[in-house]
Design a protein with these regions (language model features):
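Short, well-ordered amphipathic alpha-helical segments that serve as non-catalytic structural scaffolds
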Residues: 78-89, 144, 171, 243-245, ...
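ACP-dependent fatty acid/polyketide chain-elongation machinery
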Residues: 1-67, 246-258, 351-365, 411-415
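Condensing-enzyme catalytic core mediating Claisen C-C bond formation in acyl metabolism
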Residues: 5-9, 36, 215-290, 299, ...
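Conserved small-residue
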Residues: 10, 28, 82, 104, ...
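Acyl-CoA/ACP chain-elongation machinery
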Residues: 39, 183-229, 262-274, 304-311, ...
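Phosphate/pyrophosphate-binding loops at sites that engage ATP/ADP/AMP, CoA/4′-phosphopantetheine
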Residues: 85-98, 248-255, 283-299, 321-325
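Conserved catalytic cysteine-centered active-site region
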Residues: 1-3, 37-80, 101, 111-174, ...
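Glycine-/small-residue-rich "gating" segment that lines the acyl/pantetheine channel
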Residues: 126-132, 170-173, 177, 194-250, ...
Length: 415
């Protein structure tokens, strides 16, 4: 039996560069940073006081205020991105949609950290009686999927993956396989995160993982630049509608791209420090799954976090996986503008990779003032200006604490 093909028919996102897909994409192509000083809480006693915050977001556009008050902000972002993607795909207008065959898999790397923080404070100040009865369901990671299935009546697979900063990529790759294996015809998949809080920022700052360039937030995230000093935390959600090809064609769906490969690996090395073998394996396995060669790759949306070790390591991994062809590929980090969305990163970056294929454009990697050639960061990072390019095959890399790696391969759709 021939393997079922999976295409992308809907996109939705909430991010520091915009609260809908078109706004975000336009801002990325313009090289506009979404990073600024933290306004969500008083960060004056933390050495990193900058973040990619979602601004001017109104969850009331998607659900009632009563419902919203019972959920953590990461669930808000996930629901919003999912409903955008569902609307973009035109699923609600499809009377013949078999909702038993539609599932949702939207994960988060951390989940309801602000709710946990606020509840802990309430207990300290007033005892256990102060715990909100919606605290648990309002902070569980799988509740994004739960709420979307309830809102839309979908009765297919419903779950939320947790794999640190690889969550979004794993969710999308796993969902594509569910469709290929026949467990669903449509999957709503991606990642969401909302951890800009004292614990979230303070925790990463304690690890010395964050940029401390507080005097110039817009240039703080600078992947592959000699002056990079850590990542900038971000928040938001990115969600794709994945659909079996014949199902999409039968209803005349708009097709952005095809997802043709997914690879996973483990570093088996260190809980936070990277090594090149693990990420290279993920890329190699994804290309093998896609039936493609390294020479077929045109574009890489890199993990590219702006850390001294991570950026150099990913460059080495790409050279290991792609060989000499690595020098002919556009390697781009949209984190230079969004910051690092943690568990949502793989979701928004998969979405941006799909748009790169669909629009034949690479966003820039901004803030490359002096490329760090001495550290081996010597590839084409699409520095500082967007570029029109032939992008038939794009890969999106996501790597997470614990040495968990995921690579997605998207291809220009050709029936």
């Amino acid at each position: 039996m021939s393997q079922r093909r999976v295409v992308i028919t809907g996109l939705g996102q909430v991010s520091p560069v915009g609260n809908d897909v078109q706004t975000a994409w336009n801002n990325l192509l313009s090289g506009k940073s979404g990073i600024g000083l933290i306004t969500r809480f008083d960060a004056s006693d933390i050495n990193s006081q900058i973040a990619g915050e979602v601004r001017d977001f109104d969850i009331g556009q998607y659900i009632s205020g009563k419902e919203a008050r019972r959920m953590d902000v990461f669930i808000h972002y996930g629901i919003a991105a999912a409903l955008q993607a569902i609307d973009d795909a035109g699923l609600d207008a499809l009377e013949s949609l078999d909702k038993d065959r539609v599932g949702v898999n939207i994960g988060s790397g951390i989940g309801g950290l602000p709710s946990i923080e606020a509840t802990g404070k309430a207990v300290i100040e007033g005892g256990a009686r102060k715990i909100n009865p919606f605290f648990i369901p309002g902070s569980l990671i799988n509740l994004i999927a739960g709420h979307v299935t309830i809102l839309k009546g979908y009765r297919g697979p419903s779950y939320g993956m947790v794999s640190a900063c690889t969550t979004g990529a794993h969710s999308i790759g796993d969902s594509a396989r569910l469709i290929k294996y026949g467990d669903a015809d449509v999957m709503i998949a991606g990642g969401a995160e909302g951890a800009i809080s004292t614990l979230g920022v303070g925790g990463f700052a304690a690890m010395k993982a964050l940029s401390t360039r507080n005097d110039d937030p817009a240039t703080a995230s600078r992947p592959w630049d000699k002056g990079r000093d850590g990542f900038v935390i971000g928040e938001g959600a990115g969600v794709l509608v994945l659909e079996e090809l014949e199902h999409a064609k039968k209803r005349g769906a708009k097709i952005y791209a095809e997802i043709v490969g997914f690879g996973m690996s483990s570093d088996a090395y260190h809980i936070t420090a990277p090594n090149e073998e693990g990420p290279a394996l993920a890329v190699t396995r994804a290309l093998k799954d896609a039936g493609l060669n390294p020479e077929d790759v045109d574009y890489v949306n890199a993990h590219g976090t702006s850390t001294p070790l991570g950026d150099a390591n990913e460059t080495k991994a790409l050279k290991r996986a792609l060989g000499d062809h690595a020098r002919k590929v556009i390697v781009n980090s949209t984190k230079s503008m969004t910051g690092h969305l943690l568990g949502a990163a793989g979701g928004v970056e998969a979405l941006y990779s799909v748009l790169a294929v669909h629009e034949q454009k690479s966003p820039p990697t901004i803030n490359i003032f002096e490329q760090d050639i001495e550290a081996g960061c010597d590839l084409d990072y699409c520095a500082n200006e967007a570029r029109d390019a032939k992008i038939d095959v794009a890969i999106s890399n996501s790597f997470g604490f614990g040495g968990t790696n995921g690579t997605l391969v998207f291809k220009r759709f050709n029936d």
